[in-house]
Amino acid sequence: MPWIQLIIDTKAKYAEQVGDMLSANGAQAVTFVDAKDTPMYEPKPGEVMLWPETQVMGLYEADYDMDGVVARMSKSKVLGADFPHKLDQLEDKDWEREWMDNFHPMRFGQRLWICPSWRDVPDPSAVNVMLDPGLAFGTGTHPTTALCLRWLDALELSDKLVVDFGCGSGILGIAAIKLGAKRVVGIDIDPQALLSSQTNADRNHIGDKIELYLPEHQPELKADVVLANILAGPLRDLREVITAYCKSGGKLVLSGILAEQAQGINDLYSQDFHMEPIEIDGEWARVSGKRK
């Protein structure tokens, strides 16, 4: 069955109201996207992430009375009588299949591949992590995850103990084990992330080598390698905690950092680490070093 999409450009402060109006007027789904390719900075706790110029899209069945929807929405104070909008007809497709077709195995560095479960492994002799793309946690498609994966691929990890702060999907910890680490301790504030990490570790047959904790239960230990792909704010706030996990001579990698934030994070951690050159990928950055 074909669909019609009603697209409305609005300001961030009105976006949720517009989305609610679309839902109240029969939209089967409502999506928020960036209208002007604007970088997204860190939200405050509990804040919804919306762009200054936000495009709100409502999806309707093709035979829905769209003239009626537009007429009703034009009476709202938020939009007004002649609010700018666009109607697009979408052809009927197997959207799930099309989504799956867009994802292919990805190579990071010399040895490491991240492969969706429905794709053949390109190189059976390589280090292959099986991980399906998702929305909530990392799968290698974001530059910050890619920066960390390339860093791990270049590291000698045999028999190393690794700590992964903000483990999310477990992708970095699983990659570390596949690259030779003997044990990974993953820490995340979200119980769902810990479940995702364990599920993905089990899928890669290394579930017995990863330990997962909420912050209030995290163990005290000294690791050979510490990973933290989170955000600049938590990296600042948790500097002492993250640093304490890294033994003398141990390695540290930090990401989730915008390029303009990288030097500040680098300087902060240089108190305890010999810092390496900052690596930039588009708008994002990686900071790394060796514990003094």
From Swiss-Prot:
Keyword Manganese in annotation: no
**Phylogenetic classification of the source organism:** Bacteria, Pseudomonadati, Pseudomonadota, Gammaproteobacteria, Alteromonadales
What's a BP term from Gene Ontology annotated to this protein? methylation
Where does the chain bind S-adenosyl-L-methionine? T145, G166, D188, N229
EC numbers for this chain: 2.1.1.-
Q: What is an example of a GO molecular function annotated in this UniProt entry?
A: protein-lysine N-methyltransferase activity
Keywords, A to Z? Cytoplasm, Methyltransferase, S-adenosyl-L-methionine, Transferase
Reactions that this protein is recorded to catalyse: L-lysyl-[protein] + 3 S-adenosyl-L-methionine = N(6),N(6),N(6)-trimethyl-L-lysyl-[protein] + 3 S-adenosyl-L-homocysteine + 3 H(+)
The record's section on InterPro entries has: Ribosomal_L11_MeTrfase_PrmA, Ribosomal_PrmA_MeTrfase, SAM-dependent_MTases_sf
This protein is called Ribosomal protein L11 methyltransferase
What is the name of the gene encoding this protein?
Answer: prmA
Q: Which GO terms describe its cellular component?
A: cytosol
Q: Which organism is it from?
A: Pseudoalteromonas atlantica (strain T6c / ATCC BAA-1087)
Query: Could you tell me where this protein is found in the cell?
Result: Cytoplasm
Q: Which domain of life is it from?
A: Bacteria
Instruction: Report the leader peptide range.
Output: none
